[in-house]
Curated annotation (Swiss-Prot):
Keywords on record: Coiled coil, Repeat, TPR repeat
Gene: ttc21b
Annotated family: Belongs to the TTC21 family.
Source domain of life: Eukaryota
Recorded GO CC terms: cilium; intraciliary transport particle A
InterPro entries: ARM_TT21_2nd, ARM_TT21_4th, ARM_TT21_5th, ARM_TT21_C, ARM_TT21_N, TPR-like_helical_dom_sf, TPR_rpt, TTC21A/TTC21B
Coiled-coil residue spans: 365-392
Pfam family, one: ARM_TT21_2nd
Physiological role: Component of the IFT complex A (IFT-A), a complex required for retrograde ciliary transport and entry into cilia of G protein-coupled receptors (GPCRs). Negatively modulates the SHH signal transduction.
TPR repeat start and end residues: 4-38, 110-143, 147-180, 182-213, 214-247, 325-358, 493-526, 528-560, 564-597, 615-648, 720-753, 755-787, 789-820, 829-861, 881-914, 916-947, 948-981, 983-1015, 1019-1052, 1193-1226, 1228-1260, 1262-1295
Gene3D superfamilies: Tetratricopeptide repeat domain (1.25.40.10)
Name of this protein: Tetratricopeptide repeat protein 21B
Gene Ontology biological process terms from the UniProt entry: intraciliary retrograde transport; protein localization to cilium
Amino acid sequence: MADTDHYITAGIIYYCQEKYHQHVQNLAREGLKKYSNDPVLQFFKIYGMLMEDRVQDAIRRLEPIKDDPTVVLCSTMALIYAHKRSERVDREAVADLENKLKETRKSAGPKALYYAGMFLWLMGRTDKAREYIDRMLKISNRSREGLVLRGWLDLSSEKESTVNKSIRYFEEGIQDNKDIFALIGKAQYFMAHQNYSGALDVINQIIVNYPPFLPALTLKMRLFLAQQDWDQTLETAQRILLKDGANIDAFQILTIHSVTREGSTEKALNYLRELINALDAAEPRNPMLHLHKILPISSLCGRNQPILKQVSVVIGRIFQTAPHAEVATALANNFILQGNVTEAAGWYATAMKLDGNHLEGLTGVIQCQILQGQLEEAEQQLDFLHEIQESIGGTKELCYIQALLASRQGKEEQIITELLKKAVELHYAAVRGLPLGVEYFEKLNPTFLINIVQEYLVLCPKQPKAPGEPLSPLLKQALSILTPVVSVAPALTEPLYYTAQIKYLAGNLEGAQGSLQRCIEVDTACADFHLLMAQIHYAQGKFAECSVSLETGVSHNFKVRERPLYHLIRARVLRKTGELQEAIKTLKMTMSLQEMKRGALKKSTWGSLNSSDKVSIYLELAELLRLNGEQHEATKIIQDAINEFGGTPEEIRIVVANADMAVAKGDVEMALNVLRDIAPNQPYYTEVKQKMAQIYLNNRKDKKLYIGCYRELCEQQPGPHTSVLLGDALMNIQEPEKALEVYNEALHKNPQDASLANRIGQALIKTHQYKKAVNYYEAAQKISGQDFLCCDLAELLIKLKQYSKAEAVLKQALAHEPVSDLTSMVTDAKCLGLLGTTYQNYKKEESADILNKALELQQRILKRVPMEQPEMAPAQKQATSEICVQLAEHYVDQRNYEQAANYYKEAMVYSQDSKVKLQLSRLYLMMGDLDSCENHCSALLENHSFKEEAAMMMADVMFRKQDYTKSIELFDQILEENPDNFAVLSKLIDLLRRSGNLSKAPMFFEKALANSSRTTLEPGYNYCKGLYCWYLGQPNDGLKYFNKARKDSEWGQNAISNMVQICLNPDNEIVGGEVFEAPDEADGLLGEKRESEMLGVRTAEKLLKEFHPRTLNGRNQLALLQNHCLMATKDKANVETALSAFTEMATSEKDNVCAILAVAQAYMILRQTPRARNQLKRLSKVPWSLADAEDLEKSWLLLADVYIKLGKYDIATELLKRCLLYNKSCYKAYEYLGFIMENEQSYKDAAANYRLAWDYSNQSNPAVGFRLAFNYLKDKKYVDAIDICHKVLKAHPTYPKIEREILAKAQTSLKP
C-alpha cells in the first residue's frame, strides 16, 4: 500500500502544504506506477487537480473512488468542496453528499478518519481536523500515524501553548528514522523554537536515509537561512539544482540573495528569469503560486527599475490567468515603486471593482490621491475607510496614509509622528518572531519602511548634530526602523543611503561613511551617493577627498552641477582652502538656480534641496563675504535670509549666525543680546542656550554664567535630557561631585536610561569613589539589563584587581543561548575578551581557551560586518587584533614563542598597529631571529611615536650581529635629540660595557649635564652614574649614586636591587666559585672580611624593607633578593632555606634563569657540585637574551669554574668565549682564561688575558694585578711586572704579598 511508502506519502503531503499542485499530481502518478489503483494516491492526484481549479475534471475522477472505505470521507468532503466551487452549484448533489458524510462518519474506520482529518488540515480547517483525528486515535489504540498528524495539527496552531504540545505527539508517533512525515514535523517544531542544531540533526537523518528526497534539502536550505548562514544556504541551493535543474525554491533564494546581499541587478534578473521559467515548467496552472513566489522579490528590490519591469510583466500575465483583486493590487504596488502613480491608481481601482471590500486596494487609491495632490478627495475616502477600520482595527497602511495626508496638510508634528510610530509598530509586529526566510523578507517590505523614514526626515533637523548637542529622537527612531533592513539586506542601496544620511545628521560620520561606501560599491554611478560622501568628507575635514567625491558625482551625472547642494559643498571646500573669491563666485551663481527660487522646495527625495540647505547657502555666502572684508554685503545677505525665512523654524539659525558674526567682530554683548531674545517655545532654543553658554565660557571665561545657561535650560524645559546637558557641563568644568547630583536626579526621572547610568559610573570613578562605582554599576545593570554596563562593571573590577567578581559578572552576561544578531555577538565577544583578561591575572591556564572563543566569535563578526554594518568594520578589526595580541602575550608568558609570533602576525592582519609590530619585533629578538627583528624595526624607525623603542631594539640587534659601531650610533641619535633621556642612556651604558667601549660613557654624561643645570638632581642621571661606576669596578661610588635614585618611583626599584647586589658581592666574585678561593678561606670567611660581609648582608636586608613592588615580577624579584641575603651568610641552615625557596621558584617557572642560577649557587656553597653542575648545564642550553644576559653570564662563568676544577679546560674555554661574545668587558672571563693558560704554562697568553681582565676591571682588583705581574715575571717581562706591582701597592698598600713574591724577584732579575 502507498500509505506505507514514506517517501511518496511524505513528499505528497509536503507539496500539498507548499501548494505545489502539479508536484502533488506528478508524485501521485509516480506512486500509481508502483501501487496501481491505490485509492489514496488517486485521491491526492485529484486533490492536485482540484486545487488548480479543474473542478469538473476533479468531480468526474472522484466519483469512482468516493465509496472506497479508506478515502470515503475525504473524497466526499472534496466533492462537496468541488461542487461549491462550480460555476453552477448543484445544491441537491451537495445536500446528498453532506447527508452521506454524516452517515458514513458514524461507522468510518481509522484510515477513513485519518485521511478526512488530513484533507481538512490541508484545507486550513485545523479545529475540525482535530475532531476527526482524536476520534481516530481513540478507536485505533493511538495509532502512530494518527499521533504524528495530531502533532502536525498542534504545530499549525496559532497558540504557543498548543504548539508546545506537538513534540509530545511526534515523539510518541515516530516509529523509526524512516517516517519522513513525522521527522519533518519534529524538525519544524525545533525550527519554531529556534533549536536549529536539533532541526539540522533531524533533517540530516532524512537526507542520509532518503538521498533522493528533495524536500529535505529544501528544508535544510531554509534552516541555514534561518541561521543567517548564507554560505551554506547557497551551497545547499546549488546542491538542489544539481538534482533538479528547475527547482523553484532554489531559484527564488538565489534571486533574493542577489538582490539583498550582492546588489547585482544582472545576476538577480538572470535568476528571476530562471525562476519564472521554473514556475512555468513545473507549475503551469498555479497562478497564485507564481504570484507568491514573485512578491518577495518585488517587495525587496526597492526601486530597482529593471527588476520591477520584469516583475510587472509577470504579474500582468498572472492577472490574465487569475483576475483577482490581490493580483491587481500587487501590480498597482509595482507601478507605485516605478513612480507611475497614474497607472497604479488605475490598477487599485480595478482591484476595488473585483472586490469592493479589498482594503489594500482602497488604501492604495487614497495614497495615489495624496501623491497626486488631491488632498480633499483623499481625506473624504480616508474618513470612509476609518469608519470601516474601527470594527476590525487599524492597519499599518492606514496609519501610514493618515500620516502622509497629515504631513501634506501641514498638521502638527506630534500627530504625524504618532501615526508613523504606530505604522512601524504594526509593521514589525507582523515579522516579530519569524525566522529569516522568504516570508520574513516579504513581510519586511523595505520600501514601505523607507517611505516612513522619508516622512520622519521631513521633520528631523537638516544639519549634522554638533559635538555635545542632543540627538534628535526622530533620527533615533528613523535609524531603528532601517537597522533590521540593513542587517538582513545589506546590498539594498536605498535603505543604506538613508541610513548613511541619518548617521550623518546624527554626527556619526564614520558610521555614515561606512554605510555610504557600501552604497557606492553596489552602485558607483549614483551621483547622490557621491554628494552625500562629499558632505561627510567635508564634516571630517578631509577637503581633498571632498573635492574628489564632488567630481566623481559630476562624472557620473553632469546634471549634478545644476544642484545648489553641489555648489554649497564646493564653496565650503574653497573657503577652507583659502579661495574666497572663487567660493563667493560659486555661491552667487548658485543663488540664480531654479531650486533657489521661492516655492521651488520639494519634499525629501534623493538629492533634493530642503529649506535647511537653502538657508545654509545664504549663511555660507554671508560668512564668505565677511571673511573677504565685504561686511556690508554680508549684512545684506543675512537680511535677505531673514526676509525669506522669517517665521519659519530656520529663522533661528539665521539669528545664531548673526550672533556668530557679532562674536567674530568682538561684539560679544551684541551676540548675547540677540540670543537672549529667543524664547523657550521657539525652535532651536536648546541650541541657542548652548551657544550662549559657550560664549560665556570661551569669551567671558565666566564658569558661573556658563552653568547658569544650563540651569535656566533645565528650568524652562525640565526633563532627563536637559539634566544630562547640565551634568555634562559640570563635568566639563571639572565639578564631578555636582554633576553626580544632577545625573542622579535625571536617573530618577528616567530609571531605564543605561547611558545615563554609565555617566554616573564614570563620574564616580573620576571622583575616585571606586567602591560606590562598583555598587552603582551592579544596581544599574540589574535595573536596565544593559550588557554594556556589565562590560563597564567588569573593566572596573579588573582595574581594582577583583578578578573573581569580574568573572562572575562576565559569566552571568554570557549565560544565554547562542545569539545570531550582530549587536549581541559583538557584546558577547567583548565579554569573552574581558573574561580572558580576567583569567590572565587569575586563572592563567583557562585564559587561552576563553580568548580563542572570543577570537572565533570575532572572526564570525568580521564576516558579517562588511555587509550588515560596514561602519563597525574598523572597530571590530581592532577588537580582533587586540584579542590576538592577548593570546600572543599569553603564549609569550608560556615561552611558546612560535605560537605567540603567529598570533602577533594575525593581529597585524586585522590592524596595522605599530605597537603590535613593536611587540612582534621584541619577540623576534627573544627568539634570536635577528633578521626579522631588524626588518620590523627598520619600518618602525620611520614612526616618531615608536622611534625610540625601535632604535633601542635595533641597537640590540646590531650588538648581537657584532656591529658595535652601528649599535652605538643608534643610541647616539636618540640622545642627540634628548640628552636627558636616561632610560636610553642606561641601556647605552650597558651596551658600551658589552661592546668593550665603556670608556665612551663620560661624553654622554657631559651632554646631559650641558642640557640642564638640574641634571645632577635627576634620579635617572644618578642611576646611570651608579651603573657606570659599578661596571667600572667602583662599587662604593656606585652605591652613592644609586642611593640618590632609590626613593624615585621610576628608578627606585632597580636602584635598590643593584645596591643589594653590591652589598652582597662588592668585589663581583663568582658566587659558589672555587677556582679563585684562597686557601685560608676554604673553611669559611674569618675575621675582618667575615664581619665586612655580614655588614653587607644587614645593609642589603635593610634596603629590601624599602622595596615595595607593585607587579608580580617585582614581588618575585623581592623574594629572590631576600633569599640571596640568606645565601650570602654562608650559614648552612640559611643556605638550605634559600635553596628551598629558589627550587620552588624554578619549579613554578621552568625557564626562570635567575632562579635556576640561584639553585646552582646554593648547591655550590653547600659543596654539592654535581647537582649544581646539572642545573648549570640546563642554563648552558638557554638562548641568550638581553633580559637574562647577566644571569646567563654568571651561570656560564660558574660552570666554567666547575669544569676548570675538574681539569676540563676545553669545555671551560668554550663557555668563557661565549661570555666574551656577549660582553667584551667581562673581566672574569679573561681572568679564568688567564688561569687556564697559566696552568698550561703558556705564560705569554696567560699574561695577555690577565692584562685584559686588569684593564676591564679598571685596574681595581689586586688579585688580578697579582696574577698579571706573576705571569709577566714568568714571561721575563720584568719591567711590566714591576709596573703592575707598583700600581697594585699604590691602590692597596696593605697587599704585601705582591711586594714579597713578585716585585723583589723582578727587581733582582733586572740587576746585572
